Amino acid sequence: MLPYTVNFKVSARTLTGALNAHNKAAVDWGWQGLIAYGCHSLVVVIDSITAQTLQVLEKHKADVVKVKWARENYHHNIGSPYCLRLASADVNGKIIVWDVAAGVAQCEIQEHAKPIQDVQWLWNQDASRDLLLAIHPPNYIVLWNADTGTKLWKKSYADNILSFSFDPFDPSHLTLLTSEGIVFISDFSPSKPPSGPGKKVYISSPHSSPAHNKLATATGAKKALNKVKILITQEKPSAEFITLNDCLQLAYLPSKRNHMLLLYPREILILDLEVNQTVGVIAIERTGVPFLQVIPCFQRDGLFCLHENGCITLRVRRSYNNIFTTSNEEPDPDPVQELTYDLRSQCDAIRVTKTVRPFSMVCCPVNENAAALVVSDGRVMIWELKSAVCNRNSRNSSSGVSPLYSPVSFCGIPVGVLQNKLPDLSLDNMIGQSAIAGEEHPRGSILREVHLKFLLTGLLSGLPAPQFAIRMCPPLTTKNIKMYQPLLAVGTSNGSVLVYHLTSGLLHKELSIHSCEVKGIEWTSLTSFLSFATSTPNNMGLVRNELQLVDLPTGRSIAFRGERGNDESAIEMIKVSHLKQYLAVVFRDKPLELWDVRTCTLLREMSKNFPTITALEWSPSHNLKSLRKKQLATREAMARQTVVSDTELSIVESSVISLLQEAESKSELSQNISAREHFVFTDIDGQVYHLTVEGNSVKDSARIPPDGSMGSITCIAWKGDTLVLGDMDGNLNFWDLKGRVSRGIPTHRSWVRKIRFAPGKGNQKLIAMYNDGAEVWDTKEVQMVSSLRSGRNVTFRILDVDWCTSDKVILASDDGCIRVLEMSMKSACFRMDEQELTEPVWCPYLLVPRASLALKAFLLHQPWNGQYSLDISHVDYPENEEIKNLLQEQLNSLSNDIKKLLLDPEFTLLQRCLLVSRLYGDESELHFWTVAAHYLHSLSQEKSASTTAPKEAAPRDKLSNPLDICYDVLCENAYFQKFQLERVNLQEVKRSTYDHTRKCTDQLLLLGQTDRAVQLLLETSADNQHYYCDSLKACLVTTVTSSGPSQSTIKLVATNMIANGKLAEGVQLLCLIDKAADACRYLQTYGEWNRAAWLAKVRLNPEECADVLRRWVDHLCSPQVNQKSKALLVLLSLGCFFSVAETLHSMRYFDRAALFVEACLKYGAFEVTEDTEKLITAIYADYARSLKNLGFKQGAVLFASKAGAAGKDLLNELESPKEEPIEE
């Protein structure tokens, strides 16, 4: 290790500040673990774990209104690698699709010039992973290919569209929230636009419903909300309702099919779309803080809610196995009256002011255990959920909230108490399934009650609001290389100075120094600076001047001018001399002051008649070198004096020594030699004065008369033999002091605000700042190098400029950002892999595709050579060292908890696959391995149960640890049936019109609940037009099971009905006579595949149900449907493991196929026959080839050797390296 390492590499970057009102909803948390948000016209990308800025994307010319990460719901391989794709949309209607890692725009899309209302990637990525749907105001939805920028189709609707939501269970369902209501689209397809206008329904706002108001006076708000039965009507409500449509948000619930939430400021309504009615209300008490936003979770039926005070709350659906009533009212006979979401955790609120308020919240889509809050001042706060096992006695049972239990499983597999687990990995590993009504927890199972709490684990602060005064620390030299840090001091309008480290872009120190706006900063060394601030003038035009000297390491600051500063003319500028010895303080209406920086003493206050200064600059020349030479001579003479006899010393020499010894004693190591320095300044008439300062003497040396071609001089810069002056009229005058020539250049850019030379010996570049931008000049050639003009090539106005290094400039701008740019001043995004980060970031997406896939294989196939290791050098991976180092950095950046799991021999292959899919944010694999782990484990339980105990024991375990209901038809039949029964109970309790009652009756008949169906049919009132029909139906239902002939009649009638377009009625009749299998076949014939699957799950025995679902699998795999990933999950739920392996192999998912085969063999899920053997070896051989293509030799050898005869040739090839490189 080197004794010191100094990192002064500074890459181009942008420091961002407060957001714009347009950016309010522009934030997204990607599956890759990165958060992107809009800041004015920029898109900022940060890491959610370390809260570091990784990328700032700049290309939009207007404020960004939406950002969306592409989904990762596809199989990743070399052809479809892990990559960071992001779509951002602005107020001018432009959509840009970015390759975030490279910082380049892949494609730009423009349809109209109005703000994009909403944009989303299609979640079903089997056919294409490049499709993006956008709302172009006022009423168009357009489907784009985001890879090529091609418009696939466009469709307009009658009303203005505000936002939309895709059904997470069915890619053909889309719902639009419009200015008047909701439009349901049921034929969404990438290949053609939706056909009709969609099904339009109106929302009457809960506040405006007259029934609601009436009830509210009678019984309290909670009861009233329970009675809000219908919200969705086909009829347009009367005028006073429409104006009150204050629905903030609409979203499908990913936790259960056909449910949707509507968000209002004071309540969240949960709708069941099968009956179009409210089945749950989350209301805020009168004193509570209104909602701003809600994000529904797919795991555990949870809701993340953001409130107006910046507080984030988590609510989880209550389980009904232990209901207690909290009031004196009589308990309800049927406990499930309402879908209730209990408050389980909340984080701290923020201090809301006029300028600081919460903008938006996003939630981690992979684990759903963390939320990020974006605040208008540019802060991003990352809150993580943590679970703690709590003591039974400590629980407050009077709260009426059922307890939460930790789940039985970890990473998909039930684990023992002593096994390693990481409960905070994800929401479903923190809390178990909410039990369904009447479901008791199994005896003897280890259920530990848990509490959840939010912890602030990341905070990113933005720059405060402009104005800014910026100053870069002194430049890097050979002398200061050991302690140099590239620090930028930023003075702000609230009086504080922020110091940023420009290698990492992170805030190094924040110092509250002044009580008013900082006007200027000058560094006096690498670790100290002077800053000045002036208060607002009083009626005499006088101010309070604050000039502070700040020591950066300690943060200590002293008033540099002591007691001076109250009620005087404002300081205009401060200038520190080249050797940091002297300070010139220039006032508006008061003579110049000269100070000694080292002793903080006033050297000279100029007389009253001293000219008014308009610009001042110190000369880079001084006499320190000649002083140092004299000093060195002294030392040598002194050294000689000790050796040589006195007589040999000349008298002259000894007299010089005595003089210099005096100087030497005053300053150890030449610290306080007062060298002679000089400065120039100009007065109002443009006359140039030249003054010399040495110690405490100030001499006036020369004056140069004004140049007629120049206006009033505003600034001066001096380097080497070049002096440059700028004036009010935009002229630059270049003086060559050696050649004694001057050259004036009119820039035609009005007032020259500031000019400054670049650091570095012989570097004669100069930056000039104007009211409308900046320019870089080469003073040697007297030529402009680059120019930037507000309104022409950038949208922002420049507030201050400086040099960062010899080839990079710093611009502070009125959009609240500070940009470090190349000399060309072109806004450039950077390559993320070139960036210097203070903390390592886990993001395999940043690696080249080959490396990210090799890293995944390395993690999945542990142990290597019988050893669990996270050291990449332990395996044979003949890749270049740079890539290996990058892989090792990724491995090192994993948290200790994750490392512990990966190195645990008890951690099974299935758990490892699930963990790695979470680490990679791979949506497709996460769902595949969740379902695979569940059913492979169930199979092994059944096997062990059948050998040791009576048959009844096996299903018991299935219900105690079921697959989460968000997996819908993939769940076990018994659990799915219970859920559907609970749902129909709820629908029944909530019904309020005949239409709803009829829908409930239909559901009850399909579910085989004939008694309750008959009760509902007999409720039809005599004046209803369906009274006769319903009465007959009730008679039919009660007598239907009696005789054989009646069954054949009913079957005939049912088939006729179906043939004549009455599919639902015919299916119902078939279910009445227990011919549900036929009903399913008819539904499938008529394209109602989802309905058929539902009916099979609730009515058929396992064999018949499997038949129906297998036909569905064939349909899903057909080219016109192309939903093979869904088909795989259905096959897993049926236990058709061999078919899954075959399908994976045919889809060329070799990695997943090989891992799945290994897991199946471990669980004994395959009968090993000749056929299976053939498939297994083919899978292993193909996987070995793909690992060879990744350059992962050891993995390839491992699987080639497992493949037997099929892998023999490959094995030989791998083990005998050829002379010439193999072409891939």
UniProtKB/Swiss-Prot annotation:
Modified residue annotations for Phosphoserine: S205, S209, S402, S406
Entry annotated with the keyword Phosphoprotein: yes
Disulfide bonds: none
GO cellular component, one term: cytosol
Tissue expression profile of the protein: Ubiquitous.
GO BP field: cilium assembly; head development; heart development; intracellular protein transport; multicellular organism growth; regulation of smoothened signaling pathway; vesicle tethering to Golgi
Subunit structure comment from the entry: Component of the complex WDR11 composed of C17orf75, FAM91A1 and WDR11; FAM91A1 and WDR11 are required for proper location of the complex. Interacts (via the N-terminal and the central portion of the protein) with EMX1. Interacts with GLI3; the interaction associateS EMX1 with GLI3. Interacts with TBC1D23; this interaction may be indirect and recruits TBC1D23 to AP-1-derived vesicles.
Disorder named in the UniProt entry: A chromosomal aberration involving WDR11 is found in a form of glioblastoma. Translocation t(10;19)(q26;q13.3) with ZNF320.
Protein name: WD repeat-containing protein 11
